[in-house]
Curated annotation (Swiss-Prot):
InterPro entries: CPSF4/Yth1, Znf-CCCH_3, Znf_CCCH, Znf_CCCH_sf. It holds the Pfam family zf-CCCH_3. The gene is CPSF4L. The lineage of its organism: Eukaryota, Metazoa, Chordata, Craniata, Vertebrata. Belongs to the CPSF4/YTH1 family. One of its GO terms (cellular component) is mRNA cleavage and polyadenylation specificity factor complex. PANTHER family: CLEAVAGE AND POLYADENYLATION SPECIFICITY FACTOR SUBUNIT 4-LIKE PROTEIN-RELATED, CLEAVAGE AND POLYADENYLATION SPECIFICITY FACTOR SUBUNIT 4-RELATED. SMART domains: ZnF_C3H1. This is Putative cleavage and polyadenylation specificity factor subunit 4-like protein. It comes from the Eukaryota. It comes from Homo sapiens (Human). The keyword Membrane does not apply.
Length: 179
């Protein structure tokens, strides 16, 4: 049985392209309908959606990075106007209040993030080098390091007080890594 199931990734189904292109989706009957339970519009994320407010899919901007804790319990009343994500995504779950406040959570089926305080303060060495395979599920902190544009063109008036990285060596490298 496993041989039959394991080989399916090589096959493409005729409807996959239609789903990807959102074919067969009609326009909303009127503007302003609550779409908080709908999927995110693939075309909007690429800047290509022409349906505007009549699109049946959500037009979420990048700021919706954390799942709405009220939506998880079915209590969010803001709908499309909520600043948080209305989609169940384990990689974007909010932090557990009880675990962060008391260091323990008694709910064995808690879906919120349980982040150990020791890991909150440690930067991820892999992210600092450029890529972390664990992504948002990483137990370490991901702090973006941005090169100073003034330094790149020759001179930064802020000098060592500049908040941006000014030398390649300011990016933390793992032992044995080369630039």
């Amino acid at each position: 049985m496993q041989e039959v199931i394991a080989g399916l990734e090589r096959f493409t189904f005729a409807f996959e392209k239609d789903v990807e292109m959102q074919k067969g989706t009609g326009l909303l009957p009127f503007q302003g309908m609550d779409k908080s339970a709908s999927a995110v519009c693939n075309f909007f994320t690429k800047g290509l959606c022409e349906k505007g407010k009549l699109c049946p899919f959500r037009h979420d901007r990048g700021e919706k990075m954390v799942v709405c804790k009220h939506w998880l319990r079915g209590l969010c009343k803001k709908g499309d106007h909520c600043k948080f994500l209305h989609q169940y995504d384990l990689t974007r779950m909010p932090e557990c209040y009880f675990y962060s406040k008391f260091g323990d959570c008694s709910n064995k089926e808690c879906s919120f993030l349980h982040v150990k305080p020791a890991f909150k303060s440690q930067d991820c060495p892999w992210y600092d080098q450029g890529f972390c395979k664990d992504g948002p599920l990483c137990k370490y902190r991901h702090v973006p390091r941005i090169m100073c544009l003034n330094y790149l063109v020759g001179f930064c008036p802020e000098g060592p007080k500049c908040q941006f990285a000014q030398k390649i060596r300011e990016f933390k490298l793992l032992p044995g890594s080369k630039i």
